[in-house]
Design a protein with these regions (language model features):
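Residue-level hotspots at or immediately adjacent to binding/recognition sites across diverse folds
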Residues: 41-370
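Secretory targeting and sorting signals
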Residues: 2-6, 12-41
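Composition-driven detection of intrinsically disordered, low-complexity segments
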Residues: 7-10, 59-61
Length: 370
C-alpha cells in the first residue's frame, strides 16, 4: 500500500548475523549513546552518530536501502532513482534503470556490489522488478505485474537464489511472488495456505521491511490498515502462513506494523504506528522470542511512528528504529527504546561487518560512525 500506503509500504533480506556475545564492539559503542559523559580523566570520544553523505539528489526520497558493508550500499527511491556507493558514501553513482523515471522504487536487495534486485510499487503495471549483475550498468526487467488488483509492496531473499515479493490482497488474500534464480524469473504462489485478509488490510511500502526472512525457509510479513495489525509467518518459503494479531496501533488505514527485523528465526522486532504527522503513535514497537507466535509490546516504546528497524550485527540485544522524527536505540532486545537522533529517515539496514546505513527524504543517506 503506498502514500505510506500508495506512498509507504514496506521487506528485507535476512542479512543480520548471529553472535555468541550479547553486544559486540559496534553495539557496545551504540550503548554509549545512553551513557553519561566520560569521567574527568577519560579521553573524550564522540558518541556513535549518523553522518550524512552527499548523494546530490535532494528531490529524491529513498525508502529502499541495502547495506552490503561499511563501504558498499545501494539506495532506491522516487523518480526511478537507484544509487550505489563503494567507497563508504564519499561518492555515489546514479545507476538508475533506463526509462524508469516515472516509477517509485521502494525496495532494493543487494547481494554484493554488482548484483541487486529493485522493486517498483504501484497499481497494475507500475509494480515491477529489475535485476542487475554488473553494478547497475545494465538492468533487466524480470517482472511486470499484469493483475490490476495487485500492488506489490516489498521483497526479501533467503539467499542469493530464493526470494519472495509481497502484494496487497488479490481476491481476499495476500499475493506472494517467488523466485528460485536470484530474481531473474518470478511466479505467483498458490494462495491455498494464505489466511483471508481483513477488510482494508495491506502492507506498507515505507521502508522495504514489511517482508523479512531469517535462515533458509522462515519469512514474516507485516500488515496494517484494518481492524487489527497483524504479522503472518511462513516456515516453508511462503507456501503456508499463520497470522498473529499485534499490539500495535490499528483500526485506521494509516496505522499498523510498518517494519520487521529478525536476528534469528525466534527473536524479532516490529515497529510502526500511525504515519500521519499530527497523530500520536503509542505502542509503536513490539518484540517476539518465539518466532512471531506471540508478541509483547515494548515497555518504553519509541515516542513516535517508526517505519524502519534493524538489529545491530551479531548483537542479541541492540537494534535501531528510524522514522521521520528520529532514530531510537534499544539495548535490551526491544523492551525499551531511547531516542538518540532527531534526523528524518525512513529505512535502516546493517551489514555483518558493522556497516549500518539509513536513508529517507530529501536525498538523505547516512552511515553510522563510531
Amino acid at each position: 500500500m503506498g502514500s505510506t500506503r500508495r506512498a509507504g509500504r514496506t521487506g528485507r533480506t535476512g542479512r543480520t548475523g548471529r553472535g555468541t556475545i550479547a553486544v559486540t564492539a559496534c553495539a557496545a559503542a551504540l550503548a554509549a549513546l545512553t551513557a553519561g559523559p566520560a569521567g574527568a580523566h577519560e579521553p573524550e570520544h564522540r558518541a556513535p552518530h549518523w553522518e550524512l553523505k552527499d548523494t546530490g539528489t535532494p528531490d529524491v526520497r529513498y525508502r529502499g536501502l541495502a547495506a552490503v558493508g561499511r563501504n558498499t550500499a545501494w539506495a532506491a527511491g522516487t523518480a526511478g532513482t537507484v544509487l550505489r556507493t563503494t567507497d563508504g558514501g564519499a561518492t555515489w553513482r546514479n545507476v538508475s534503470p533506463p526509462g524508469a523515471g516515472e516509477l517509485q522504487f521502494r525496495d532494493v536487495e543487494a547481494f554484493d556490489a554488482r548484483r541487486a534486485v529493485v522493486l517498483a510499487i504501484g497499481e497494475g503495471e507500475a509494480s515491477r522488478v529489475y535485476r542487475t549483475d554488473d553494478g547497475g550498468a545494465t538492468w533487466t526487467e524480470s517482472f511486470r505485474n499484469t493483475e490490476p488488483k495487485a500492488f506489490y509492496d516489498c521483497l526479501a531473499f533467503f539467499d542469493h537464489r530464493h526470494g519472495l515479493a509481497l502484494s496487497d490482497p488479490v481476491d481476499g488474500k495476500f499475493r506472494i511472488l517467488s523466485t528460485g534464480d536470484g530474481g531473474r524469473t518470478w511466479r505467483v504462489l498458490p494462495d491455498r495456505g494464505m489466511p483471508p485478509a481483513q477488510d482494508g488490510e495491506a502492507g506498507f511500502a515505507a521502508s522495504g521491511q514489511c517482508l523479512v526472512t531469517s535462515g533458509p525457509k522462515d519469512v514474516w510479513l507485516a500488515t496494517g490498515g484494518a481492524a487489527d495489525a497483524r504479522v503472518l509467518h511462513s516456515a516453508d518459503r511462503g507456501h503456508t502462513w499463520k497470522a498473529t494479531t499485534m499490539p500495535l496501533p490499528a483500526g485506521d488505514p494509516a496505522r499498523g506494523v510498518f517494519a520487521l527485523a529478525f536476528r534469528d528465526r525466534a527473536h524479532g522486532l516490529a515497529v510502526g504506528g500511525d504515519f500521519r504527522p499530527e497523530q500520536p503513535s503509542p505502542r509503536a514497537a513490539a518484540r517476539t522470542s518465539d518466532g512471531g507466535r506471540t508478541w509483547r509490546p515494548a515497555t518504553a516504546p519509541p515516542t513516535a511512528y517508526r517505519s524502519g528497524v534493524a538489529w545491530l550485527p551479531h548483537s542479541r540485544t541492540a537494534a535501531l528504529a528510524v522514522g521521520p522524527t528520529g532514530t531510537d536505540l534499544t539495548t535490551d532486545a526491544g523492551r525499551t527504546w531511547r531516542t538518540v537522533d532527531t534526523g528524518s529517515y525512513d529505512t535502516v539496514d546493517c551489514a555483518p561487518d558493522h556497516g549500518c546505513w539509513a536513508a529517507g527524504e530529501q536525498g538523505r543517506v547516512a552511515r553510522l560512525e563510531h
